[in-house]
């Protein structure tokens, strides 16, 4: 959180809980949950009904498949305030604010975000220069 606004949710690889837990508020445009079920537990076959939804902000979920990644957080005015380290198996949902990444080790990430992707438009993202390495403040978990 930054100034009471939830910018990201990080789930570390060693996270453990029973049953199902959602980390996101119900009104988030992207939902992130964790499930732990015993052998033999059944999730009944189902489908998701067509429901018109409005998406105003792109939210990204990144799964760190391998390596080590630094994520840098900025407020909505592009002012840097802290960084976190993500390791193999960690998951992050990027909700609001600005963010950038630096690979600390060779890394693989799987990304999930809302679509449709419109490469011809490219108005969903604005780029700016990253914070200098000597200004980085790593926040420990």
What are these regions (language model features)?
Residues 45, 71-72, 92-94, 99-104, ...:
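Short beta-strand His + acidic residue motifs that chelate non-heme Fe in jelly-roll/DSBH
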Residues 100-141:
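Double-stranded beta-helix
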Residues 34-56:
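Conserved short histidine dyad/triad with adjacent acidic residue
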Residues 38-39, 57-74:
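Glycine- and acidic-residue-biased ligand/ion/polar-headgroup-sensing regions
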Residues 75-96:
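Short acidic-glycine-tyrosine-enriched beta hairpin
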């Amino acid at each position: 959180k930054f100034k009471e606004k939830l910018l990201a949710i990080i789930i570390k690889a060693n996270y453990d809980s029973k049953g199902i837990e959602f980390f996101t508020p119900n009104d988030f445009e992207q939902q992130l949950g964790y499930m732990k079920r015993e052998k033999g537990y059944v999730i009944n076959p189902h489908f998701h009904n067509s429901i018109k939804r409005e998406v105003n902000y792109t939210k990204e979920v990144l799964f760190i498949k391998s390596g080590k990644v630094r994520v840098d957080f900025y407020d909505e005015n592009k002012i840097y305030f802290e960084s976190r380290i993500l390791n193999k198996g960690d998951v992050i949902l990027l909700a609001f604010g600005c963010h950038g990444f630096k690979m600390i080790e060779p890394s693989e990430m799987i990304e999930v975000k809302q679509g449709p992707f419109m490469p011809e438009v490219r108005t969903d993202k604005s780029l700016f220069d990253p914070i200098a390495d000597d200004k980085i403040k790593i926040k420990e978990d």
